[in-house]
């Protein structure tokens, strides 16, 4: 809880975004007219990747915090992602449009398909709009008009690439940080020289065994700076 205001917390995962959507709120008797809202969207999360949805077999993942949220909130058992890929799902979630209506049915594109293209793909993808229109009505714009301070931390990807126009501030967000954190390549592989206990490691593990996470740090900054006003945070992990 960031402040005395009640906080509504929505949790989802791409590929099965709407599979887990627990809602956590304070006592309804003390619920303000404009509760704080935190929407957490994780990338490439399957419904069996969180322990609280383990039905028949032991889960290989340990997700204690998500499990705790699910016990206090609501779990949806028959809810599905608007699309199995990144940009189409994100656009649909933010705008409320089906990917086909939003002309976002593929991950990359931005132009008409090319016939007889010499690639390894045998299928010609449909035309794909390169970006979500700036004048699109988004969740952030609606909340902004209703007195919310809106913030985004993490992945955006609602256009050809992560940094293409329009950006979050063009779609209704007062504040945005899309820092990934790790910037250098990991050699010889992604498991070496990263988040170690070495003194000079920029991403040294903390006392709980976790590396520094830029998305989380930025999200906490937004929450602390806006704790005394109604806020909406869209927290999308890379």
Feature locations, PLM:
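Structured segments of extracytoplasmic/periplasmic soluble domains
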Residues: 44, 48, 53, 68-73, ...
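Bacterial N-terminal signal peptides
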Residues: 8-19
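Active-site-proximal N-terminal segment of extracellular/periplasmic enzymes that hydrolyze or transfer
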Residues: 27-74
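Solvent-exposed loop/turn segments at secondary-structure junctions
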Residues: 44-47, 75, 82-87, 99-101, ...
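Short, structured active-site-proximal loop/turn typified by the sulfatase FGly-forming signature C/S-X-P-X-R
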Residues: 58-90, 96-101, 149-151, 174-180
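N-terminal export leaders
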Residues: 1-8, 37
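Formylglycine-dependent
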Residues: 103-149, 156-238
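Signal peptide processing junction and immediate N-terminal pro/mature segment
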Residues: 18-27
